[in-house]
């Protein structure tokens, strides 16, 4: 079972001006069809490294980021826009976070009108034995928790 919330967020300005911070040190690379290959790759020093606040700019994201401490409620991501003094924090018990910058959006929305921060299990997990198991057996119970918190921030 791999349920995810595909809501789009925009804190009031152009998406390129939003800044992102991720609590992830790894991600799952994909093939030419955007299907995870089974590899878990490090982020440190790569263009996908959001371990410090970084403006989204024109970077197109549609990547699954691996979160530490699977099963514990912890911060997965923070998104902020200094111009509006707004910040969104995403907390979850899920093992991964799909980040999508909406580059493929079309009518009635424009490309990059929002960003998805989707707490989830690993995509393609049933076909990748090294990914966390997402199979829910008969009689099993599925529980997960995801919190979206909004707050005002001070301008610096």
Regions found by a protein language model. Give the residues of each.
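An exposed, glycine/acidic-rich loop-and-rim segment of catalytic or binding clefts
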Residues: 1-156
């Amino acid at each position: 079972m791999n349920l995810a919330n595909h809501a789009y967020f925009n804190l009031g300005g152009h998406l390129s001006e939003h800044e992102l911070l991720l609590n992830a040190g790894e991600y799952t690379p994909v093939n030419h069809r955007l299907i995870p290959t089974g590899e878990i790759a490090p982020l440190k020093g790569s263009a996908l490294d959001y371990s410090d606040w970084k403006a989204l700019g024109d970077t197109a994201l549609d990547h699954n980021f691996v979160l530490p401490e699977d099963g514990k409620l912890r911060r997965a991501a923070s998104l902020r826009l200094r111009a509006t003094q707004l910040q969104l924090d995403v907390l979850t018990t899920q093992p991964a976070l799909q980040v999508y910058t909406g580059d493929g959006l079309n009518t009635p929305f424009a490309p990059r009108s929002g960003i998805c921060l989707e707490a989830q299990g690993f995509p393609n997990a049933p076909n990748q034995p090294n990914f966390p198991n997402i199979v829910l057996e008969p009689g099993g119970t599925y529980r997960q928790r995801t919190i979206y918190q909004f707050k005002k921030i001070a301008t610096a």
